[in-house]
C-alpha cells in the first residue's frame, strides 16, 4: 500500500457556546496549526477543514460518518469530559473498527501525574472507516499537550494504518 498523495484532515470543534458565537473557538485552530507544522515538516501535501458544531449527538454522528470515507485524519476537540453535555466519546466509540487506547492512556497518565484533573478526560483514538480519529479535550492547553504526544507517533501510526512496515530498512 502507499501513503496518500495528499492528506485530508478534518478538525471538529464541539462547543455549544462557541457555536452560538458567545466566544471564539481557539482549540480547533490550535489543532490546525500543529497539524500544518507537522505535515510541512514531513514534506507532505495536505488540506485541513474546520467544523464547529454544538454538543449534539446526531450532528456529531452524522459528521463523523460522512467524513470517515473521505478524510485520512479526524480530530475532535471538546466533549471528552464528564459533564452532562460531553458526548464525544459515546458517539465516536461505537463507530470505531479498532480502538488505539495506548496513546490516550499515556497522555492521561503523563499529564495527570502533575495535574490530577487531566485524568478526567475520556478522549479516545482509533480507526473509523478510512480515517484515524483522535478525540481531544476542549481547552487550548490540553490540545497542546495532546498534540505534542500524538504527533510524536503520528508518522508511524499513518505508516501502519496504510500497511507499510516502517521497520524494514528498504522503506
Which functions belong to the PLM regions below?
Residues 1-171:
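Non-catalytic beta/alpha edge segments that cap or flank active sites
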Amino acid at each position: 500500500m502507499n501513503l496518500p498523495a495528499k492528506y485530508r484532515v478534518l478538525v471538529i470543534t464541539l462547543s455549544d457556546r462557541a457555536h452560538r458565537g458567545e466566544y471564539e473557538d481557539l482549540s480547533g485552530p490550535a489543532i490546525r496549526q500543529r497539524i500544518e507544522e507537522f505535515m510541512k515538516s514531513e514534506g507532505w501535501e495536505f488540506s485541513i477543514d474546520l467544523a464547529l458544531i454544538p454538543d449534539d449527538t446526531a450532528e456529531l454522528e452524522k459528521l463523523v460518518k460522512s467524513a470517515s470515507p473521505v478524510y485520512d485524519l479526524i480530530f475532535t476537540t471538546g466533549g471528552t469530559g464528564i459533564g452532562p453535555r460531553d458526548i464525544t466519546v459515546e458517539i465516536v466509540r461505537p463507530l470505531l473498527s479498532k480502538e488505539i487506547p495506548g496513546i490516550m492512556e499515556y497522555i492521561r497518565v503523563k499529564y495527570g501525574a502533575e495535574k490530577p484533573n487531566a485524568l478526567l478526560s475520556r478522549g479516545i483514538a482509533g480507526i473509523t472507516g478510512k480515517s484515524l480519529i483522535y478525540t481531544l479535550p476542549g481547552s487550548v492547553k490540553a490540545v497542546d499537550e495532546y498534540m505534542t504526544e500524538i504527533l510524536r507517533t503520528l508518522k508511524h501510526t499513518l505508516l501502519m494504518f496504510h500497511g507499510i512496515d516502517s521497520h524494514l530498512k528498504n522503506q
